[in-house]
A protein has these predicted regions:
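The feature captures the beta-strand-to-loop junction immediately N-terminal to the Walker
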Residues: 35-40
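Conserved structural motif at the start of ABC-family nucleotide-binding domains
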Residues: 7, 22-24
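Helix N-cap at the start of a conserved alpha-helix in ABC-type nucleotide-binding domains
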Residues: 43, 162-164
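Conserved ABC transporter NBD signature motif
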Residues: 60-74
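Helical segment within the ABC ATPase nucleotide-binding domain
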Residues: 165-178
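ABC-family P-loop ATPase nucleotide-binding domains
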Residues: 83-139, 146
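Catalytic Walker B motif of ABC-type/P-loop ATPase nucleotide-binding domains
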Residues: 151-155, 160
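Helix-to-loop junction immediately C-terminal to a conserved catalytic motif
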Residues: 53
Length: 191
């Protein structure tokens, strides 16, 4: 493994019964790269992301993140944004920030607060009182406020307006360190 290679997928295949969701994927992602997974719904983007995060086991092939199979170590260096809301929507935004700061040692509370201010999201709001787009922005803020080596974003812009989409993409590009990599999936070709 080259020291610059952060993600290596070799012959990655995932079947669900007789249906093949992913067939023999070979992918290398170097440090500091921004890669987009583009494809229609059902093309294997989320399956690939779940395999990278160790949430699924491959039918065949292998995944290495920083030289390790998905597990405890890789979870500590990956900041993952799933395609569905996973947060407790009864919590206030500032409580979610505190929760992430307590849970992740690499969480940057100042960065999260600055991004909330930029998007004019009230930290005292309960998540469920925010629009769908603002809920997605909060999830992205929490994900991008970690000092991770790899940011894995599954359809982060699917439900937001075009102006917010631009902010999210620029945030994804500008708020990670120079050596961090970003893997973003989308089915929207304009992105």
């Amino acid at each position: 493994m080259d020291n610059n290679e952060l993600v290596i997928c070799q012959g990655l295949t995932k079947n669900y019964g007789k249906k093949t969701a992913l067939n023999n994927l070979n992918l290398t992602l170097g440090r500091g790269q921004f890669i987009g997974l583009l494809g229609p719904n059902g093309s294997g983007k989320t399956t690939t992301i779940k395999l990278l995060n160790g949430l699924l086991q491959p039918t065949s092939g292998s995944v290495l993140i920083d030289g390790q199979a998905p597990g405890t170590y890789t979870h500590s260096i990956i900041s993952y944004l799933p395609d569905k809301n996973y947060l407790n929507d009864a919590m206030k935004v500032n409580d979610l920030i505190s929760f992430f700061a307590d849970f992740y040692t690499d969480f940057d509370r100042v960065k999260a607060t600055d991004m909330l201010d930029s998007l004019q999201i009230d930290p005292l709001s309960r998540l469920k009182t925010l629009s769908k787009g603002n809920q997605e922005k909060v999830q992205l803020i929490l994900t991008m406020s970690r000092k991770a080596q790899l940011y894995v974003l599954d359809e982060p812009i699917a439900g937001v307006d075009p102006a917010a989409r631009d902010y999210i993409l620029s945030t994804s590009l500008s708020n990670s360190s120079e050596d961090a990599s970003v893997l973003l999936s989308t089915h929207l070709i304009a992105d």
